[in-house]
Curated annotation (Swiss-Prot):
Residues 91-172 form the Core-binding (CB) domain. This is Prophage integrase IntS. GO terms for molecular function: identical protein binding; prophage integrase activity; sequence-specific DNA binding. Keywords: DNA integration, DNA recombination, DNA-binding, Viral genome integration, Virus entry into host cell. Integrase is necessary for integration of the phage into the host genome by site-specific recombination. In conjunction with excisionase, integrase is also necessary for excision of the prophage from the host genome. The active site is at R234, K261, H324, R327, H350, Y360. It comes from Escherichia coli (strain K12). PANTHER family: PROPHAGE INTEGRASE, PROPHAGE INTEGRASE INTS-RELATED. It comes from the Bacteria. The gene is intS.
Amino acid sequence: MLTVKQIEAAKPKEKPYRLLDGNGLYLYVPVSGKKVWQLRYKIDGKEKILTVGKYPLMTLQEARDKAWTARKDISVGIDPVKAKKASSNNNSFSAIYKEWYEHKKQVWSVGYATELAKMFDDDILPIIGGLEIQDIEPMQLLEVIRRFEDRGAMERANKARRRCGEVFRYAIVTGRAKYNPAPDLADAMKGYRKKNFPFLPADQIPAFNKALATFSGSIVSLIATKVLRYTALRTKELRSMLWKNVDFENRIITIDASVMKGRKIHVVPMSDQVVELLTTLSSITKPVSEFVFAGRNDKKKPICENAVLLVIKQIGYEGLESGHGFRHEFSTIMNEHEWPADAIEVQLAHANGGSVRGIYNHAQYLDKRREMMQWWADWLDEKVE
């Protein structure tokens, strides 16, 4: 392997020459003396050379790092020379994605557009963004999907496949691709399907309460789990909760329309239990984050999407209970006790347009929901072994 001293000592000769570093990486020294890092590699049976960077602008370690990244791409069938060429024109996946995104975001909420952009920026574009879109093979797109599957994010994996498919279709109709590999990947994915989430029958709730009382992990995750049960919110709605939208005086939480499934503001009355929990939490996360349930390592983000599931797993209820299961239990028990169906549906944010006679802003139903949610919180607390 090369050393810095060898590189600095390399002088131009009558003919160009190479100083080998290893694994295909070498320093090319032309007659002019302007040294260049290059990587020799083979793909699809053909030998190619990638110009990695110029010395001394790119150090030895930087060249090794870039060569390592290129070799990793090669191992999954990505040609770094083609990727470099594609990144400089408007036929790369990244360039076409940006066109598609600008076209589509006009009909999306700001929150959804931001969430989708983050998914592409974090997990998709770093892998295939620099490739000519017409050269992307199914295996290369599958490599992207595997990133989600490997961390258990099956729903996001399917979402990524569908949205990538839309980018390919956009490329096809604009004359820059002829084939969309996304639909063909469905059979290769790890069995994603819409499923019924686990929930507990009423007679098992006391045992769950007892187990939850033994949890000794993150206080933020524990309070998140309890608030999720008391409010019957969706996990996404809970995670997005901001301190500015928690009104202790009027005892309501407002969930922004951008994160709601129905794209409407959701007003949630707070029971005594929720007020107490959020008051406790305010001394922990409010000084350091806008998020009520701030992440452990990055206070600029909320807790991870699996935080509540991890609590459930730790207390021994994996596969038996879930965040969505809390909502099912709330709906079942409240209907069994003959609370107004409309009030239950509004609390679950199932209301859509005029489906419950426009009662989102009806004071009577907010008052009824205050009463209902206090009854629900008390009912849960009474279920002890």
